[in-house]
C-alpha cells in the first residue's frame, strides 16, 4: 500500500525483494518532490551547489531533508525515486496519524519556506507514478512464488456470483491468490 507502513510479503526478506525490484525495473526512476530522509543519496556536487541541511531552521530529524530537496529542485537538480531498489524502513514513526510538536513545527517551517511543497507532494501521491513499477514487482513476486493466481471477472448485477467468489477465495486462502475485476 502506497504511503503506508507495510509488512514484508510472506517468504520475502529485504534482500530478496531488492533483487526482484532490480530485475523487474532495471534503471527506472521517477521524479519526486522530496526524498525520504532515512534513505537518501546526495551527490557531492549537488550538496556543494545547494548547501547542507538547514539544521538552524529545522533541527535534526524532521523536515530538513524535505527543505534540501526543495532547494535542490529550485537550483535545477532532480529528486529521483529509484524503482529498481527496495529499502525497508523498520521501526519508524513517520506513518503515524498524530504528529509530534517537532514534526508540526517542521511542517510549518516548510510551508513558510516552500509554499508549493504540500501541493506538490499531494499531486505526486495522487498521480502515483511509481505504481506500475510496484505492480510489476507484485506480479513477478506471484510468478516466483508458484502459487496459483485466479482472476475472477464479475458483473455488477444482483445474484450470488460475488458471494460465491468470496467464499471460494476464502476456502482456497493460502493455496491461491484471488483478484477480482
Task: Spell out what each predicted region is.
Residues 66-73, 166, 170:
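Short, hydrophobic alpha-helix immediately C-terminal to the catalytic nucleophile
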Residues 1-51, 59, 66, 75, ...:
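Acidic/His-rich active-site region of diverse nucleotide-sugar glycosyltransferases
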Residues 135-181:
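N-terminal subdomain of nucleotide-sugar transferases
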Amino acid at each position: 500500500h502506497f504511503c503506508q507502513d507495510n509488512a514484508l510479503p510472506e517468504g520475502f526478506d529485504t534482500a530478496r525483494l531488492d533483487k526482484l525490484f532490480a530485475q523487474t525495473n532495471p534503471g527506472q526512476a521517477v521524479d519526486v518532490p522530496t526524498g525520504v530522509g532515512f534513505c537518501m543519496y546526495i551527490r557531492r556536487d549537488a550538496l556543494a551547489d545547494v548547501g547542507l541541511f538547514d539544521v538552524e531552521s529545522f533541527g535534526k530529524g524532521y523536515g530538513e531533508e524535505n527543505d534540501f530537496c526543495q532547494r535542490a529542485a529550485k537550483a535545477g537538480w532532480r529528486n529521483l525515486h529509484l524503482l529498481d531498489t527496495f529499502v525497508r524502513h523498520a521501526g519508524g514513526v513517520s506513518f503515524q496519524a498524530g504528529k509530534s510538536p517537532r514534526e508540526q513545527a517542521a511542517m510549518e517551517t516548510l510551508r513558510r519556506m516552500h509554499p508549493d511543497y504540500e501541493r506538490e507532494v499531494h499531486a505526486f501521491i495522487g498521480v502515483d507514478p511509481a505504481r506500475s513499477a510496484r505492480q510489476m514487482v507484485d506480479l513477478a513476486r506471484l510468478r516466483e512464488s508458484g502459487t496459483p493466481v485466479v482472476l475472477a471477472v464479475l458483473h455488477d448485477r444482483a445474484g450470488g456470483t460475488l458471494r460465491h467468489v468470496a467464499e471460494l477465495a476464502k476456502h482456497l486462502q493460502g493455496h491461491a491468490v484471488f483478484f477480482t475485476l
